[in-house]
């Protein structure tokens, strides 16, 4: 299997795991663990795993002796801010307030956001077709935020959807920022620093909440779901993302987010955690149409 095919497989697995995460994490929040407390646990657990793996690989001589250049530390701090702190805090808080399907649909706007940010940062010209697509996507996202009603424990779908959108924008910044780091360093050389910096950024938001959790009433099934989010949704998915982004462009990686609503919908509906309705279907059609126009290659 070629490196590109491995990267495509990794990107697909990321979408499957994230599609499951929308429902699995929703089962934990807010009944057993507040979103910010969950983020402290998630980022802290993943940080520990990354450092342990780095130490193991270093002791066994499986890592190059590259060191982070002082000039790249601002980029690492920025990656931690957009890819860990803002991204995860807004996503989990938003998911705790809205439904799995709505959150997954809004995440589809990420490819459009990446292209807009690329155009701003790289000074690329935006075509009329792309502007039309952005408008359609914005209408669909706004429609879902304002009118998308949810089932189950969704307590404030409008605010939740808005926070998920902020998360998508932040993730778009992260995809652009981290690209240079991946081509310069081994993944474990810089990812441990990104997560360590991110952990200290999220700690003030969630530590107080984390300390108030009554772990005695948390059932075993919830512990397994917390473990899934830490190990698979965070640790494994981050490594798979790095593998895919070494061979694929940020725009290509972002396009795989299109698969997340499919997997999230299948998983959520099969478990009775969410339902489809007219608002979600119409919003999805507008957003997907916008994404198609924005990412359509010029013939």
Question: Where do the model's predicted regions map?
Answer:
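Membrane-interface helix termini and inter-helical loops of multi-pass transporters
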Residues: 24-35, 63-65, 96, 145-157, ...
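Hydrophobic/small/kink-forming positions within alpha-helical transmembrane segments
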Residues: 19, 23, 80-85, 89, ...
């Amino acid at each position: 299997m070629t490196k590109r095919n491995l990267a495509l497989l990794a990107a697909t697995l990321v979408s499957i795991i994230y599609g499951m995460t929308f429902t699995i994490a929703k089962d934990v929040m807010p009944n057993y663990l507040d979103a910010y407390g969950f983020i402290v646990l998630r980022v802290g657990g993943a940080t520990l795993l990354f450092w342990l793996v780095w130490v193991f690989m270093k002791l066994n001589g499986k890592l190059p002796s590259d060191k982070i250049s002082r000039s790249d530390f601002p980029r690492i701090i920025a990656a931690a801010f957009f890819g860990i702190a803002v991204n995860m805090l807004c996503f989990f808080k938003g998911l705790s307030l809205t439904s799995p399907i709505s959150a997954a649909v809004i995440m589809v706007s990420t490819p459009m956001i990446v292209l807009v940010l690329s155009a701003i940062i790289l000074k690329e010209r935006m075509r009329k077709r792309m502007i039309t697509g952005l408008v359609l996507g914005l209408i669909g996202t706004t429609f879902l935020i304002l009118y998308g009603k949810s089932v189950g424990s969704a307590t404030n779908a409008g605010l939740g959807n808005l926070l998920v959108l902020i998360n998508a924008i932040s993730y778009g910044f992260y995809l652009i920022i981290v690209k240079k780091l991946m081509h310069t360093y081994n993944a474990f050389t810089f990812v441990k620093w990104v997560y360590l910096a991110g952990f200290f950024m999220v700690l003030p938001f969630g530590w107080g909440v984390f300390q108030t959790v009554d772990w005695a009433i948390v059932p075993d099934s919830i512990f397994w779901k917390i473990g899934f989010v830490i190990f698979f949704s965070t640790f494994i998915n981050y490594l798979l993302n790095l593998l895919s982004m070494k061979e694929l462009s940020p725009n290509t990686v972002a396009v795989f987010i299109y698969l997340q609503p499919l997997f999230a919908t299948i998983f959520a509906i099969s478990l009775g955690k969410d339902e489809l309705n007219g608002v979600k279907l119409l919003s999805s059609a507008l957003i997907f149409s916008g994404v198609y126009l924005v990412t359509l290659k010029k013939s």
